[in-house]
Swiss-Prot record:
Sorted UniProt keywords: Cell membrane, Membrane, Transmembrane, Transmembrane helix
Main location: membrane
Keyword Membrane: yes
Protein name as it appears in the record: UPF0132 membrane protein AF_0736
Cell location: Cell membrane
GO cellular component labels: plasma membrane
Length: 95
């Protein structure tokens, strides 16, 4: 559920859920999808950035679906970079 609305649900679950598993996914979702959102908004400013922004958006949809499926199955997984940061923030070791 932390991935349902990208970083928005990540923030909500981080605030209201105490489960370490859910909190990890909430932080990971918030970091990942807020970064992607910023890229999609800022990239069109650069030359050729509009196309790159669309590529990032397509990638994010695939990543979003992947995260929803994995988390709904209760699987512990870390995304590169953001999973490590989430783990550090929560002082957990899932993988």
């Amino acid at each position: 559920m932390c991935y349902t609305l990208g970083f928005v649900t990540g923030v909500l679950f981080l605030l209201f859920d105490r489960s370490p598993f859910v909190r990890f996914h909430a932080v990971q979702s918030t970091l990942t999808f807020s970064t992607i959102t910023a890229l999609v908004i800022l990239l069109p400013v650069l030359p050729g950035g509009a196309l790159l922004s669309r590529v990032v958006m397509a990638f994010s949809i695939i990543l979003w679906a992947f995260c929803i499926v994995k988390a709904s199955r209760g699987e512990a997984f870390k995304l590169p970079i953001f999973g490590d940061i989430a783990e550090e923030q929560l002082s957990l070791n899932y993988t």
